[in-house]
């Protein structure tokens, strides 16, 4: 049997590992070499980076392309990908979705209506919304439907613009 090889950045180096039992070779284990972890298999050692929830192989084409584009930030993402994704989702909820009902409540309670809107579009939208509410079983007056629709649209516009 040939000794296992190790690949780092496309270079192949030979590494002699003491003999192991077949059970250990099948399970696979990690060895420490120059402060890096390598996954042992009988034929090839591949460098892997482990986080608490996920393992990303560092020899994939996508990973190499990402390293060229982002550099230092990609290494930080590589160590803890799920924490970065969770932080993005949390900040998105905090900055985009949470202000929507707050602005809607402010516009609805202050009875504010934006000026300069074409009346024919508001009337057409109010009739469509009133027919949808009627199909759902809500019999609301047309004026209340148009006010609610206008407050929702204004809140959405403020959140998206700001």
Curated annotation (Swiss-Prot):
Tree of life domain: Eukaryota
Positions in the Mitochondrial matrix compartment: 46-84, 143-162
Localisation per UniProt entry: Mitochondrion; Mitochondrion inner membrane
One Gene Ontology biological process: mitochondrial gene expression
InterPro entries found in the cross-reference section: Mrx11
Annotated GO CC locations: matrix side of mitochondrial inner membrane; mitochondrion
Transit peptide: 1-45
Mitochondrial intermembrane face of the membrane: 106-124
Membrane-traversing stretches: 85-105, 125-142
Keywords: Membrane, Mitochondrion, Mitochondrion inner membrane, Transit peptide, Transmembrane, Transmembrane helix
Membrane topology: Multi-pass membrane protein
Disulfide topology: none
Family recorded in the similarity comment: Belongs to the MRX11 family.
Protein name: MIOREX complex component 11
Species of provenance: Schizosaccharomyces pombe (strain 972 / ATCC 24843) (Fission yeast)
Organism placement in taxonomy: Eukaryota, Fungi, Dikarya, Ascomycota, Taphrinomycotina
